[in-house]
Amino acid sequence: MNEELRRKNEGITQDSSSLLIPHSSLTIENLVAGYPGRVLVRNLFLYLPAAGFVAVVGHNGSGKTTLFRVLTGQLPYEGRVQLLGQEIRTLRRTAAAGLLGYLPQRGTIDFAIAVRELVVMGRYRHHGLLSAYNPADYALADAALARVGMAHLAARDFTQLSGGEQQLVWLAQLSLQDAQVYLLDEPTQQLDVYYRRQVFGLLHDWATNHGKTVLCSTHDLDNLPELTGHLLNLSEPEPQLRPLSAATVLQARHWLERAPAPARS
């Protein structure tokens, strides 16, 4: 069964499997993770290619955030989890190494800061603790803001922006980390229709045009059929990658309209 799940997730044949596995950006085998008395992810197998977009869906409590906490090294786990061929539990600073970029669920900043100054902080791994950002860093920040359509707000106070504008600024900062794998935990939460489409469009562009692996947890199913990539529904008993399409999104919607399964101990 484990081998069958692996092949379903990769969409490969017997002859091609040995060629594709070494190029996986993320390999998960028999993952078990959760919290005392409550297992949220059990026996998960997942093999992601070196580039692509993956929408991670599921009920609240199905393990979406738990999976991301494992991948960012914040939560112990059982099983095998390899990021670009390296076991996660042996990596101390995936972000500093340029392997992984992570945008958690929307937070707040309670102090005034110019948008440009916030975005340039995405270059932190290229500098020492006390070194200053240079003109080249700011040029990259300006380019990142232009790509997300926020260049005209570079001098504005970030705290005065709308929720959608703030999220695009966070994406600009995240892009400056230039990681191979990006995790985004519900990046369209509480955004209106326009900004949800903007965010998904940017993430899809990272995967299809810039060779990044993008995992995006979301409850927003409406925009997914328009994207190219895969869908992972953690509410299924045996989650597996499925191509994104109107049919697979509808299937996921039917799953999510059911009552969630009881938490496992």
Predicted regions and their residues:
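Conserved ABC ATPase signature
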Residues: 157-161, 165
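The feature captures the beta-strand-to-loop junction immediately N-terminal to the Walker
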Residues: 57-59
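H-loop/switch region of ABC-family ATPase nucleotide-binding domains
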Residues: 218-219
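Conserved ABC ATPase "signature" region
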Residues: 120, 135-153
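Conserved ABC transporter NBD signature motif
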Residues: 79-87, 96
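Catalytic Walker B motif of ABC-type/P-loop ATPase nucleotide-binding domains
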Residues: 182-186
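Helix-to-loop junction immediately C-terminal to a conserved catalytic motif
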Residues: 72
